[in-house]
């Protein structure tokens, strides 16, 4: 695939100069849904499919983007002087958002780029194609400008920062972290409250994880994602009036049941219950996987898939 992206780049922008290629994977979350913005645990892993990029630095501040996935859009032209927060209107919002984020974090992007992208992540499938674009852009910028002090965790945080502030999606850290820190044959057991993590080998003897497509398109920006997060934040504020906690992820199931009546709205109570119970399921699922108890791991995954429908009114994608 890399060669096809390079061939496309040469056809559009010429094959001369320092053209560099990059790749960032997609991700799937095995368990831990709607917990990352509630200070809980998640258990994602990177995929072999992802986003390929060919890029060449320019001498001016012009930006030229082309996606092999959106051929009808043609070459999208912009510049480093034309950041339009929340108003880009197409896929270039993600690489431009990362360029903006680098600038905001003290790492100037002072030269433009010619960029060709191709992703073999199905768009809107819930496998984090947008976070993959953000991450591959961050890796490219770090390399092109020699910003060696930027770590992969920094790139994940910059991706979340750009998603929150440039694209207006109040996402947690899971997608970008899983993509930036993914490791072959492992999932990442991540505590989103402090970013402590460990790699857990995924060795399923006699079993296989299958990612299936429901044919329901999903995009964080046009889903109920921001609304669900706001509901959880309000529920947390209500609980904090009776219990000293910083996030819903700190609560056990028993502790939640003891304080749940502090949440005045029954819908918000459902949202918070899911966050707390799902966090506990995630911890239990990782323990089951480590013990090679695949049946228990599967039971917890099934419960994880049911809970968002019952308590957050969201469907699997």
Over which residues does each language-model region extend?
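A general alpha-helical scaffold signature found inside nucleotide-binding enzyme cores
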Residues: 48, 93, 154-157, 227-234
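Short, well-structured alpha-helical segments that form the helix of a local strand-helix-strand
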Residues: 153-163, 297-302
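C-terminal nucleotide
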Residues: 1-27, 52-88, 186-315
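ATP-binding N-lobe of GHMP and related small-molecule kinases
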Residues: 1-127, 131, 135-152, 161, ...
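Surface-exposed charge patches
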Residues: 100, 157, 287
């Amino acid at each position: 695939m890399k060669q096809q992206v390079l061939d496309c780049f040469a056809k559009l922008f010429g094959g001369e100069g320092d053209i560099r290629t990059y790749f960032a994977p997609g991700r799937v979350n095995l368990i831990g849904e709607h917990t990352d913005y509630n200070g809980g645990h998640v258990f994602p892993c990177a995929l072999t499919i992802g986003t390929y990029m060919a890029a060449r630095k320019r001498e001016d501040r012009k930006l030229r983007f082309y996606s092999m996935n959106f051929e009808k859009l043609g070459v999208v032209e912009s510049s480093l002087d034309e950041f339009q927060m929340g108003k880009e209107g197409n896929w270039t919002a993600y690489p431009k958002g990362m360029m903006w984020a680098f600038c905001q974090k003290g790492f100037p992007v002072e030269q433009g780029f010619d960029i060709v992208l191709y992703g073999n992540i199905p768009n809107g499938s819930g496998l984090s194609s947008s976070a993959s674009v953000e991450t591959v852009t961050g890796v490219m910028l770090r390399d092109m400008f020699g910003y060696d002090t930027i770590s992969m965790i920094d790139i994940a945080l910059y991706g979340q920062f750009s998603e929150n502030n440039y694209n207006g999606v109040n996402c947690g850290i899971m997608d970008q972290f899983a993509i930036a820190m993914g490791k072959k044959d492992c999932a990442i057991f991540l505590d989103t409250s402090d970013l402590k993590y460990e790699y857990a080998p995924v060795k399923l003897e006699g079993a296989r994880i299958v990612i299936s497509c429901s044919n329901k398109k999903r995009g964080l920006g046009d889903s109920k994602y921001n609304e669900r997060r706001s509901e959880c934040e309000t529920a947390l504020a209500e609980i904090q009036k009776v219990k000293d906690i910083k996030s819903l992820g700190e609560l056990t199931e028993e502790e939640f049941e003891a304080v749940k009546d502090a949440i005045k709205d029954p819908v918000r109570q459902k949202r918070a219950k899911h966050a707390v119970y799902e966090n506990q399921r995630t911890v239990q699922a990782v323990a089951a996987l480590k013990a090679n108890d695949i049946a228990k791991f599967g039971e917890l995954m099934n419960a994880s898939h049911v809970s968002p429908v019952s308590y957050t009114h969201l469907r699997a994608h």
